[in-house]
Amino acid sequence: HNPEDWQTIARINKLTAPYIIYADGEIEVPLSLLKMEELSLEVVTVSGKAVLQRENGKGAALTQGMRIAPGETVMTGEESFVQLLFPNGVYTRIDPESALTLSYLLSLADGKIKAEGLLSKGKLTNTLKKQLRFNDSMRTRTPVVITGIRGTEYRLKADGERSATVETLEGVVSVQSGSKTVRLRADQGLKAQEG
């Protein structure tokens, strides 16, 4: 876009002269600086009662085939679940009495997909049938942790505002809480608490 964008990226990532970024390193780039196309999720399965809370505050009964846009929230009732499909092949099952907001879902100019959801309460399972493409990202937040798919399947439970539980079923999942990041392999889990 413009030459000052680099200064913004350097400031956000706390880079100092000579501004070296190493191979396999990660940097944060504000979405406002990226060329992108906004995408939506597909509702694959609805069992029981589920509601789609739109960004304008209006709610609607969730049905199979509906599309979910960034800013919208899926809420499941008692004994209900919803299964969603992301464009990159990730399936998300939202368990009973849960709420997941799609923070963003976009395709960059190079076709890479970036997605993030916020699980404010309840439990979900993310399942990936095949490895994500290089530089695709799929993150799910709770009030306490951020998880990123590095493998194939994991569960995430938001235990209120102060704790979260992550269980890796297959593959590897990256979990960040505060300034600490750990990688959980299959059959590993953790419970993170605020503070």
Regions found by a protein language model. Name each.
Residues 23-26, 32-195:
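Flexible, surface-exposed loop/linker segments and immediately adjacent secondary-structure boundaries
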Residues 3-38:
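Extracellular LysM carbohydrate-binding repeats and other cell-envelope/extracellular binding modules
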